[in-house]
Amino acid sequence: MTVFEGNTVAAAIAAGLKQLHRTRDQVEVEVIAEAKKGFLGLGKHPAQVRLTVVPASAAPATTPTSATATAQQSVATESTTAPTMPRPTVQTPKSTPTRQAKTSQATTSAAKPATSKAKAVAKPASMAVTTGPVIADTDQSKPATTSKTKSVAADQSQTPRTPAEIAARQAANETAVRALCDYLLAVVKELGVTADLDVDFGNRYATLNFDTTKQGLLIGKHGRTINALQDLAQVYMNHHGASHVNVVLDVDDYRERRAATLKRLAESTAREVIATGKQVFLDPMPSFERKLIHAELANNHHVTTFSEGRDPHRAVVVAIRK
């Protein structure tokens, strides 16, 4: 049994099926938690599902006897409920064996299409037999898909189309970034750090580089302080209507040096897993750092990576590829 996560229940199931190399009818699904959007980016957590691979012997099989019985029952139901047309009564002196044979043959030929039709109807019914948890999860995945479609439609409706709308959106984003800079400088000042900000601003991104003599205090242990400030900055932009702008905070090229460190960590961890045959849990990381680990080992044919846990304690696991 393995726990998988995703933005929706359906996305979590899809990620699990891809990881396990299984189809939907080969696993049992148990929904552990629904996805929550949170408030202003706080309290948000993904949907969680637990997938259990169903043994091959447990798969339901439809026997020929049961299919034949179902077909015969369907034929009997059709013959009972079908309206009968009145037929004229013809008096004959004697029924010959030839006529009886023809009547019996006609009855048999008429029953064959009905029987085959009943079998054709019964076959999809037997294929639709699945375990209880999977059916329940399918019902829950429909509202998630609908809400995702509505969200995409809402984003498309809010996307500026005319040059005037694009210019207005750009001006609003610049205003939000300026306000964010003032807010961040006030926050770090309370930490005892005097700094300036260099801004690299685009249509959907904003990179803010702190210029200060107290880089270590602003970065924190393993980058925890700068990462917390970055999360706070993203929440600030979301609150000011610029959620589509991705904010990155940097100081003294820390992000570049951290990326190089993570790549070396991924390579050394992969060598350790290959040598020992045991999976290794890395320290908890933010999502953008976990993506660097996944990307670095994606082309390694000996190990595989996946994430476990919930933010902020979600961590990458490196294991032997099966």
Curated annotation (Swiss-Prot):
Region (Disordered): 58-162
Residues in R3H domain copies: 256-322
GO molecular function: RNA binding
Phosphothreonine carried by residues: T89
Disruption phenotype: Cell length is reduced.
Chief localization: cytoplasm
PROSITE patterns in the record: R3H
Cellular component terms (Gene Ontology): cytoplasm
SUPFAM superfamilies referenced in this protein's UniProt entry, alphabetically: R3H domain
Alphabetical list of InterPro entries matching this protein: Jag_KH, Jag_N_dom_sf, KH_dom-like_a/b, KhpB, KhpB_N, R3H_dom, R3H_dom_sf, R3H_KhpB
GO BP annotations listed: cell wall organization; peptidoglycan biosynthetic process; regulation of cell shape
Domain (KH): residue spans on this chain: 174-251
UniProt KW keywords: Cell shape, Cell wall biogenesis/degradation, Chaperone, Cytoplasm, Phosphoprotein, RNA-binding
Subcellular location: Cytoplasm
Compositional bias of kind Polar residues: 89-99, 141-161
Chain positions covered by the region annotation Jag_N domain: 3-52
Bias-annotated ranges (Low complexity): 58-82, 100-129
Domain free text: Has an N-terminal Jag-N domain, a linker with a phosphorylated Thr, and 2 RNA-binding domains (KH and R3H).
NCBIfam families membership: Jag_EloR
Protein purpose: A probable RNA chaperone. Forms a complex with KhpA which binds to cellular RNA and controls its expression. Plays a role in peptidoglycan (PG) homeostasis and cell length regulation. Necessary for correct cell elongation.
Assembly and interaction partners: Forms a complex with KhpA.
Protein name as annotated: RNA-binding protein KhpB
Origin species: Lactiplantibacillus plantarum (strain ATCC BAA-793 / NCIMB 8826 / WCFS1)
Gene of this entry: khpB
